[in-house]
């Protein structure tokens, strides 16, 4: 379906700091994308790459938070890639944010031809597909966003390692019950791993993990105290509100 014919909605995120046009069906921008952007460290002049960017939620949130960061949104789905480009334009970020229709698992030559040479990124952020293929969504767009093979995570992290400069950092969000998969996939190229569990409320098991790792660094892993999205009554915590609506950064340093 063409971007012009796709049924979409215009949704404000970050307390209205961004307005995103996105399909009514399929994967939609939610807490995961905003948490991922908030946990990504970058500074003015850096080049960040958002792998599997969808309509650009995480990458655009990063660009909104940090002035001067250049962001490339990589997305395989043509409708979503077109929406990502349009969202950069409508939020007045197209001078620093561009969208590419490209498979994250494409070759180094394909990435270079698109202007993404090895070692060209200071940071990579990603929200990889995490549903096993035995349980795919019947919706095609949602299936592209969520369905994973046994090697998806490893392949995405290899792409990240190739794109990153020597001291570059990858940040990702993943299912909490898949943390072992993340650590195994990071082992080849990354170290100095920091893990932040994300809990829906006090006493509940983590539903997500935010993970940051540095290319070529072999420092030991750090497991941080969990981050709470809501209190026992279901009300968003002040920390969650500051990030999800206020656009603040989410520290993964343990401070």
Where are these regions (language model features)?
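Conserved SAM/SAH cofactor-binding pocket of Class I
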Residues: 39-138
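Short, low-complexity, intrinsically disordered N-terminal peptides in bacterial proteins
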Residues: 1-14, 47, 110-118, 249-255
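SAM/dcSAM-binding transferase cores
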Residues: 205-255
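Class I SAM-dependent transferase core
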Residues: 2-43
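Conserved Class I SAM-dependent methyltransferase catalytic core
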Residues: 25, 150-206
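Residue-level signal for inorganic ion chemistry
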Residues: 36, 156, 213
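Conserved beta-strand segments of alpha/beta enzyme cores
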Residues: 19, 70, 96-98, 191-194
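Mobile active-site "lid"/loop adjacent to the S-adenosyl-L-methionine
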Residues: 128-155, 159-162
């Amino acid at each position: 379906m063409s971007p012009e014919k796709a049924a979409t909605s215009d949704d404000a995120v970050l307390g209205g700091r961004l307005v995103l046009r996105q399909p009514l069906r399929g994967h939609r921008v939610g807490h995961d994308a905003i948490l991922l952007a908030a946990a990504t460290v970058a500074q003015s002049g850096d080049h960040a790459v958002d792998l599997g960017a969808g309509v650009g939620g995480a990458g655009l949130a990063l660009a909104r938070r940090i002035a001067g960061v250049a962001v490339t949104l990589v997305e395989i789905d043509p409708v979503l890639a077109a929406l990502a480009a349009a969202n950069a334009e409508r939020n007045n970020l197209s001078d620093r944010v561009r969208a590419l229709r490209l498979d994250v698992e494409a070759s180094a030559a394909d990435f270079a031809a698109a202007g993404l040479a090895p070692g060209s990124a200071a940071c990579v952020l990603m929200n990889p597909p995490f549903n096993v293929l035995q349980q795919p969504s019947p919706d095609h767009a949602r299936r592209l966003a969520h369905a994973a093979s046994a090697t998806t995570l490893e392949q995405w992290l290899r792409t990240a390692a190739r794109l990153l400069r020597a001291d570059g950092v990858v940040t990702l969000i993943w299912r909490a019950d898949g943390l072992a998969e993340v650590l195994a996939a990071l082992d080849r190229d990354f170290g100095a791993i920091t893990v932040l569990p994300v809990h829906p409320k006090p006493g509940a098991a983590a539903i997500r993990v935010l993970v940051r790792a540095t290319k070529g660094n072999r420092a030991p892993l750090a497991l941080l105290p969990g981050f709470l999205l809501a209190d026992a009554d279901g009300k968003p915590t002040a920390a969650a509100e500051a990030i999800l609506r206020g656009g603040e950064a989410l520290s993964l340093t343990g401070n």
